[in-house]
Curated annotation (Swiss-Prot):
It comes from Mannheimia succiniciproducens (strain KCTC 0769BP / MBEL55E). Its main location: cytoplasm. This is Ribosomal RNA small subunit methyltransferase G. SUPFAM superfamilies: S-adenosyl-L-methionine-dependent methyltransferases. CDD domains: AdoMet_MTases (cd02440). It is found in: Cytoplasm. Pfam families: GidB. It comes from the Bacteria. The gene is rsmG. Its EC number is 2.1.1.170. InterPro entries: rRNA_ssu_MeTfrase_G, SAM-dependent_MTases_sf. One of its GO terms (cellular component) is cytosol.
Length: 213
């Protein structure tokens, strides 16, 4: 039986998605709503996010993650400092043909992600409990995703060992600061800065794509 909150989230998600160019199946929409419900439930006990309102989670966590989807190139991605699986889990839900490693150093976050993977039957997600500098992957990645790093230099310094030859860094950021680029090592180059439209989100959002030279 669908409860009132689930119904409201489903309706709200439909409204939000209509303001984007994303094409998402009904099953995927349902999984995104279930993810919000799970996050809301776990958050009460484990304090996984400062966002308390499920409707707000839909905008600040789900939509903010999925709008990046059209820009992803490749099949194998790692979300570094994923927290409660953001942007990795929403992206995995709407990209069943791509594989995602979700990395975080905090046990309660990885426990939540493992639970979400099980509940939502996500066969394309591997949760990993580790600090990024200690993580040695079996395969290098097509894309390194993160919304956890305050500055680009930190992301490229900490994650330099993760991309494959053609792999890219995808930094999800608020306001784009040109100064950040100046601070980066010469081994890295910004190849694109995309202004993202996240429906009903106050403030700027950007996707910064970086490649290793």
């Amino acid at each position: 039986m669908v409860n009132k909150l689930e119904q409201e989230l489903t309706q709200k998600l439909e409204i939000l998605l209509k303001q984007t160019a994303l094409s998402i199946s009904d099953q995927q929409k349902n999984k995104l709503v279930q993810l919000v419900l799970l996050l809301n439930k776990w958050n009460k006990a484990y304090n996984l996010t400062s966002v308390r309102d499920p409707m707000e989670m839909l905008i600040k966590h789900i939509l903010d993650s999925v709008v990046v989807s059209p820009y992803l190139q490749g099949d194998l991605f790692i979300d570094v400092g994923t927290g409660p699986g953001l942007p990795g889990l929403p992206l995995a839900i709407i990209n069943p043909d791509k594989n995602f490693v979700l990395l975080d150093s905090l046990g309660k976050r990885i426990s939540f992600i493992r639970n979400a993977v099980r509940e939502l039957e996500l066969s394309n997600v591997v949760p990993v409990l580790s600090r990024v500098e200690e993580y040695i992957p079996d395969h290098k990645f097509d894309g390194i995703l993160s919304r956890a790093f305050a500055i680009l230099k930190d992301m490229t310094d900490w994650c330099h060992h993760l991309p494959n030859e053609k792999g890219l860094f995808y930094a999800l950021k608020g306001v784009y600061q040109q100064e950040e680029v100046m601070d980066m090592s010469n081994n890295f180059q910004v190849i694109d800065v995309i202004k993202l439209h996240v429906p009903e989100l106050i403030g700027e959002r950007h996707l910064v794509k970086v490649k290793k030279m």
